UniProtKB/Swiss-Prot annotation:
Name of the gene encoding the protein in the UniProt record: dapF
UniProt keyword Cytoplasm present: yes
Residue stretches spanning the membrane: none
HAMAP family reported in the protein's UniProt record: DAP_epimerase
Protein name: Diaminopimelate epimerase
Source organism of the structure: Acinetobacter baumannii (strain AB307-0294)
């Protein structure tokens, strides 16, 4: 069968977006892995699925699958692209959209020239909300790594789990070495996204993220939210912060006790069709 799809990206964090309202398809783990292959498939960080909602207050259901085929709760760059996709495909004429995710409801607002502002919901910090194994809540935790190495982390759930550590320079940070250890650390029973943040000043940070089930990506929207919130909680950052990632910049806003707002661009790369039989087992 022919499957229609759209390739999009948010700051280089790239997606294959599939409308399963207007067409039907079964995409299992192995099929998703083959589609994600950058040499033999479409190639993407995440697969985004548009489905009818299960709850009356939502316009759409938004499902996210990593390149390894694992389903995750949230993707910030993805939800911006999702909002643009459903609007451009005329699945809705709304510019303020209510979207159901595994992590709850998010509310993207379409702006001009592909920019989207998203209400990302409330950040969570308690160990059982991450989830993270700890005897009691603390401002910072020490994580033991290989070769007697320790790092200090903050933990934040932005719909998916994040560990944030501050580094002197993101360019020299050992993301490739430390990232996989943090991602699969035994204290994170559902694994975690590992963020490495450099504070430039109180309104500007640089960030690299080693994403759960993907590896390092050019940008991570929920990672930017988690890093900014972590810095704000530590008293290092103002309530509105520019987060600079390899793929570009996001603006993150947060007040204690309120929801997190993320604003950033989206890019529609191309539309395509493929014969799904070639990617199924």
């Amino acid at each position: 069968m022919l499957l229609e799809f759209t390739k999009m990206h948010g700051l280089g964090n790239d997606f294959m977006v599939v409308d399963l309202i207007s067409q039907r398809a079964y995409l299992d783990t192995a099929t998703i892995q083959r589609l994600a292959d950058r040499h033999f498939g479409v190639g993407f960080d995440q697969l985004l699925i548009v489905e009818p909602p299960d709850v009356p207050e939502a316009d759409f259901k938004y499902r996210i699958f990593n390149a390894d085929g694992s389903e995750v709760e949230q993707c910030g760059n993805g939800v911006r692209c999702f909002a643009r996709f459903v609007h451009e495909r005329h699945l809705t004429n709304k510019t303020n959209i209510t979207v159901q995710t595994k992590a709850g409801i998010v509310k993207p607002e379409l702006g001009q020239n592909g920019w989207v502002r998203v209400n990302m919901g409330y950040p969570k910090f308690l160990p059982n909300e991450i989830p993270f194994v700890a005897e009691e809540p603390e401002a910072l935790y020490t994580l033991e790594l290989a070769n007697d190495q320790n790092i200090s982390i903050d933990v934040v759930n932005m719909g998916n789990p994040h560990a944030v550590t501050i580094v002197p320079d993101v360019l020299t940070a050992d993301v490739a070495g430390i990232g996989p250890q943090v991602e699969s650390h035994k204290r994170f029973p559902e694994r975690v996204n590992a963020g490495f943040m450099q504070v430039i000043d109180d309104k500007h940070v640089r960030l690299r993220v080693f994403e759960r089930g993907v590896g390092e990506t050019l940008a991570c929207g929920t990672g930017a939210c988690a890093a900014a919130v972590s810095g704000m909680r530590r008293g290092l950052l103002a309530n509105s912060v520019e987060v600079e990632l390899a793929g570009g910049k996001l603006q993150i806003e947060w007040q204690e006790g309120d929801v997190v707002w993320m604003t950033g661009p989206t890019t529609h790369v191309y539309d395509g069709r493929l014969d799904l039989r070639y990617f199924q087992g």
